[in-house]
Amino acid sequence: VPARVLNYLSDFSAFRPTFCEIANSSTDGLTLDGNSFLPQLHGETGNPREFVYCWYNRDMEPGKTQVTARNQRYKLYKGGKFYDVPNDLQEKQPLVTDSLTPKQVAIKEELQDVLNHYEQFDRLSQVIDGRQ
């Protein structure tokens, strides 16, 4: 595979299906959240992610968990902060809800749906924060 930079979203969940595809190992019967990125490595379109979900708590301290969903351009934090990442790499200026374009409103709603979907699996935050 030639060296190249790919502008596709990917995360850790993509490694298992990619390695299974490389090894010609079936993923039938497995519940996988990620998509193989092997086609993209070969210059094909593949099935890239439309969003990435991230859960982060570096020190496992109560109240310090950061949860985000993002697409190629925008990132939404649980709690509502919404950023135009290429235009605000350090995330210093969250977009103001009243100033969003209709397209940005739709994207924010899509990313909120992602956060809502994955919240049902977020048992670790509940334990860390003492909610369980």
Locations of regions flagged by a protein language model:
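C-terminal cap/loop subdomain of S1 sulfatases and analogous C-terminal strand-loop tails that border
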Residues: 1-4, 8-87, 118-125
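Cytochrome P450 catalytic domain signature, combining two hallmark sequence patches
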Residues: 47-48, 99-103
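Charge-dense polyanion-binding interfaces
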Residues: 101-125
